[in-house]
C-alpha cells in the first residue's frame, strides 16, 4: 500500500467524494489499520477500532465495505465505503449505503428475514423475537407498496424520506 502510484490514487479520487489530500489521509489511516501489512483490512483489524467494535451493526458495515465478498477490504473498497459518509456525498449515496445494511444477500430487496436479522442485531435481547417479528411484519406491510413481500430501494427511499439521512450519515473529518 505504501507504493500506491499516483495514477491509482487519482483513479480512487475520481471514483469517490474525496479530494487528493483526503484520500492521502485515508491511505495513512488504512495503513495503520492494516496491522499485518497485507494490503487489506481483515474483519479482526476492523473490529480493533473502538468505534466499530461497539457498533451492533459492525459485521454488516464490514460486509458492505467488502464489495467483492473476498472477506477483507482493500484500499479502494475502504475509500468507496467511506465515500458515502463524506459531506460531499449526496442523499442517494447515503440511502444506498443504509439500504445495503439491510440487504444482506445483495439481491436489491430487503426481505422479512433480512429486516428481522438486522433489527435483532440492533435490539439484541431487549425485545422478544415474537415482538420483533410483529414490528418487522408491520414495517414490511407499510413499506411494501407493490405488495411483493419485500422492500425495494425505491420503497425504502419512500419509507425514510421524512428522516434526515444525509445529516445522520455524514462525517465531517476524514
UniProtKB/Swiss-Prot annotation:
Entry-linked SUPFAM superfamilies: EF-hand (SSF47473)
Residues reported to bind Ca(2+) 4: 144, 146, 148, 150, 155
User: What additional remark is attached to this entry?
Assistant: This protein has four functional calcium-binding sites.
Q: Does this UniProt record's set of keywords contain Repeat?
A: yes
Q: Record-annotated residues binding Ca(2+) 2?
A: 66, 68, 72, 77
Any Gene Ontology biological process: conjugation with cellular fusion
State the organism named in the record.
Neurospora crassa (strain ATCC 24698 / 74-OR23-1A / CBS 708.71 / DSM 1257 / FGSC 987)
Q: Which GO terms describe its cellular component?
A: calcineurin complex
* Name the UniProt record assigns to this protein: Calcineurin subunit B
